[in-house]
């Protein structure tokens, strides 16, 4: 008798979209909606760096495949940028252009994580990192960190407690999605020392590096280039999420292995999107970021003040504990009540063991829409 088809176990162990539970309900809302659930921007990319600004006459071959590592001029621009920001003498072999930061990080994880290996993840964390580890057959280990530690010593102790003989890497996202925290230099130096003592890889998710409002962003590569990977994204830096372009940097040998995985999944990042990324790096990108950073900082401060929580130090998010406002339906009921009022926020369990939290993105819609959405949320939490 033939064996019936079956599904592989790894995707069955992974979560689907973190938003699907509320979006159908939101779609049924008859009034204005406030999509504060997704980490995106309402702004268009810089003028001259949009898809409409690219022409075949100027860029013959823009609809053909790019080299798997990336368009050479873009690879060079990334190397130049990273050298300036980190002080590390990187070369082309240390970098590849990915189909977005998400794809790049997945390929790095696939290059360094073997089945049953563990990856310590500072939590709350970006939702998809757990899936990356599971795709490699590894085990994600949440480390309560943001909001749970308050010094270099407690930061190091929190991570060290979570390590086992199977731990191979530590994932650090700063500025943080979802908390808006920026990890201080002294804490990062402590984590680097810990990684060296335990011979761990360091995965630095730095896609919000340009959006720091208080404190400083410390590039991970500048602290431990021999064991660190840094992931960056045009999605967050330059408002190009739909283009799917980012880059990975790290030690040449494992970067080459990660590039193999990228080649066998997306082959290469979209050529036209890479051309737009090159334009933004060589042209108006810095000016766009300066203006955008000021707008984001203002929006974050206003949202935090209205909700009665501390201002974010970076990224584009607030992470709220709504436990006092939950009834017997738990967080699901809170999300349903929000959706019935036109508001979508992201559920806390997507970011780790946070069953009473929600995440708010204060840049995903124009400021007036965000303000009205924050008013709805303030009413729900009794502010």
Predicted features and spans:
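N-terminal small-domain helix-loop-helix segment of the aminotransferase-like
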Residues: 3, 9-100, 107, 280-283, ...
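Helix C-cap/helix->beta junction micro-motif
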Residues: 29, 136, 197-198, 341
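Short beta-strand
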Residues: 33-35, 231, 308-313, 349-350
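Conserved core of the PLP fold type I
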Residues: 62-193, 210-224, 229, 368-370, ...
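PLP-dependent enzyme catalytic core of the Aspartate aminotransferase-like
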Residues: 80, 160, 340-344, 351-383
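Conserved core segment of the aminotransferase class I/II
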Residues: 226-297
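Conserved glycine-rich beta-strand-loop-beta hairpin in the small C-terminal domain of fold type I
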Residues: 278, 293-304, 309-323, 354
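Short, conserved charged micro-motifs
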Residues: 326-334, 368-372
């Amino acid at each position: 008798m033939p064996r019936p088809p079956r599904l592989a176990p790894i995707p069955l162990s992974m979560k689907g979209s973190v938003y699907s539970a509320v979006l159908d309900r939101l779609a049924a809302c008859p009034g204005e909606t406030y999509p504060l659930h997704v980490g995106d921007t309402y702004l268009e990319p810089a003028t001259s760096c949009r898809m409409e600004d690219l022409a075949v006459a100027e860029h013959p071959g823009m609809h053909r495949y790019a080299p798997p590592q990336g368009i050479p001029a873009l690879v060079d621009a990334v190397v130049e940028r990273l050298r300036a920001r980190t002080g590390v003498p990187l070369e082309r072999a240390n970098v590849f252009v990915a189909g977005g930061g998400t794809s790049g990080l997945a390929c790095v994880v696939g290059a360094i994580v073997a089945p049953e290996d563990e990856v310590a993840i500072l939590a709350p964390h970006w939702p998809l990192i757990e899936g990356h580890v599971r795709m490699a057959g590894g085990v994600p280990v949440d480390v309560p960190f943001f909001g749970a530690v308050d010094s270099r010593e407690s930061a190091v102790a929190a991570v060290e407690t979570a390590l086992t003989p199977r731990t191979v890497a530590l994932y650090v996202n700063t500025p943080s999605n979802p908390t808006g925290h920026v990890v201080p230099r002294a804490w990062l130096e402590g984590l680097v020392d810990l990684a060296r003592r335990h011979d761990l890889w360091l995965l630095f998710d730095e896609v919000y590096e340009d959006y720091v409002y208080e404190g400083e962003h410390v590039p991970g590569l500048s602290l431990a280039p021999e064991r660190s990977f840094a992931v960056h994204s045009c999605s967050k830096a330059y408002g190009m999420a739909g283009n799917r372009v980012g880059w990975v940097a790290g030690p040449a040998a494992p970067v080459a292995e990660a590039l193999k995985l990228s080649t066998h999944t997306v082959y290469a990042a979209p050529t036209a999107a890479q051309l737009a990324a090159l334009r933004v790096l060589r042209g108006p990108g810095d000016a766009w970021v300066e203006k955008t950073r000021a707008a984001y900082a203002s929006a974050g401060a206003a949202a935090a003040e209205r909700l009665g929580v501390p201002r974010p130090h970076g990224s584009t998010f607030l992470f709220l504990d709504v436990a006092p406002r939950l009834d017997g339906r738990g967080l699901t009921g809170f999300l349903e009540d929000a959706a019935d009022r036109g508001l979508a926020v992201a559920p806390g369990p997507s970011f780790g063991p946070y069953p009473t939290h929600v995440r708010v993105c204060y840049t995903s819609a124009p400021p007036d829409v965000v303000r009205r959405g924050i008013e709805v949320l303030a009413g729900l939490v009794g502010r």
